[in-house]
Amino acid sequence: MARYRCCLTHSGSRCRRRRRRRCRRRRRRFGRRRRRRVCCRRYTVIRCTRQ
């Protein structure tokens, strides 16, 4: 199974696997407003990238 680098997307469950720890820290800044759309500023993509 491929690993996904981003945390966000529409089909979140399987994408939210990787980079969870790092995202949790940055997520606090955006609050609940952008939480769904952005996880990590670096990985702001609409689809997950396979590694």
Swiss-Prot record:
It comes from the Eukaryota. GO terms for cellular component: nucleosome; nucleus. Testis. Keywords: Chromosome, Developmental protein, Differentiation, Disulfide bond, DNA condensation, DNA-binding, Nucleosome core, Nucleus, Phosphoprotein, Spermatogenesis. Disulfide bonds join 7-15, 40-48. Transmembrane segments: none annotated. It is found in: Nucleus; Chromosome. InterPro entries: Protamine_P1. GO terms for biological process: chromosome condensation; sperm DNA condensation. Its main location: nucleus. It holds the Pfam family Protamine_P1. GO terms for molecular function: DNA binding. Phosphorylated by SRPK1. Cross-linked by interchain disulfide bonds around the DNA-helix. Protamines substitute for histones in the chromatin of sperm during the haploid phase of spermatogenesis. They compact sperm DNA into a highly condensed, stable and inactive complex. Belongs to the protamine P1 family. This is Sperm protamine P1. It comes from Bos taurus. The lineage of its organism: Eukaryota, Metazoa, Chordata, Craniata, Vertebrata.
